[in-house]
């Protein structure tokens, strides 16, 4: 039997507003509905999915720090606006040496110029951007195929 893969899903600032915020960009599904759907898919893929959403950078950093002790095998992170500003989150991800996939609902390269730089992409295993909420599911599928083999 395949080992259960422990995945931490981190959603950054304003993603708690999914379903209400800029529906033309982010759609109308709420974060809780998304998480429920991801957990259902995770079970099929033999993934244990833990999730956190925070609007506070330090909370995200502390969760990344604790991921090693929690035996997290892989991280999926949508850092949202912290993508473009947080060297501290970058440093935390480097420090714990847990592989991660960066996910963005919208195509950050097709939006405002200031959104086109990510402090995380060059240290990630991959970046999924602009595929809507499907990007999270693609990240799970990728982890299922590549992790812990």
Curated annotation (Swiss-Prot):
CDD domains: DHQase_II
EC number of this enzyme: 4.2.1.10
UniProt-listed SUPFAM superfamilies: Type II 3-dehydroquinate dehydratase
UniProt keyword terms in alphabetical order: Amino-acid biosynthesis, Aromatic amino acid biosynthesis, Lyase
Pathway assigned in UniProt: Metabolic intermediate biosynthesis; chorismate biosynthesis; chorismate from D-erythrose 4-phosphate and phosphoenolpyruvate: step 3/7
Single biological process term from Gene Ontology: amino acid biosynthetic process
Residues annotated as site: Transition state stabilizer: 21
Keyword Lyase in annotation: yes
GO molecular function, one term: 3-dehydroquinate dehydratase activity
InterPro entries, per the entry: DHquinase_II (IPR001874), DHquinase_II_CS (IPR018509), DHquinase_II_sf (IPR036441)
Catalytic activity annotation: 3-dehydroquinate = 3-dehydroshikimate + H2O
UniProt: substrate binding residues: 78, 84, 91, 105-106, 115
Pfam families registered for this protein in UniProt: DHquinase_II
Residues at the active site: 26 (proton acceptor), 104 (proton donor)
Family annotation (NCBIfam families): aroQ, PRK05395.1-1, PRK05395.1-2, PRK05395.1-4
PANTHER family recorded: CATABOLIC 3-DEHYDROQUINASE (PTHR21272:SF3)
Function: Catalyzes a trans-dehydration via an enolate intermediate.
Subunit text: Homododecamer.
Family of this protein: Belongs to the type-II 3-dehydroquinase family.
UniProt protein name: 3-dehydroquinate dehydratase
Gene that specifies this protein: aroQ
């Amino acid at each position: 039997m395949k080992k259960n893969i422990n995945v931490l899903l981190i959603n950054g600032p304003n993603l708690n507003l999914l379903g209400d915020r800029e529906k033309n960009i982010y759609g109308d599904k709420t974060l809780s509905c998304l998480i429920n759907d991801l957990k259902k898919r995770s079970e099929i893929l033999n993934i244990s999915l833990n999730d956190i959403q925070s609007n506070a950078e330090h909370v995200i950093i502390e969760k990344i720090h604790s991921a090693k002790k929690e035996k997290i095998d892989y991280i999926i992170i949508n850092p949202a606006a912290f993508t473009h500003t947080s060297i501290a989150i970058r440093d935390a991800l480097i420090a714990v040496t847990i592989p991660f996939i960066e996910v963005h609902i919208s195509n950050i390269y097709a939006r405002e110029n200031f959104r086109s730089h990510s402090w995380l992409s060059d240290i990630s295993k991959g970046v999924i951007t602009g595929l809507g909420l499907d990007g999270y599911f693609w990240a799970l599928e990728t982890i299922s195929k590549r992790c812990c083999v």
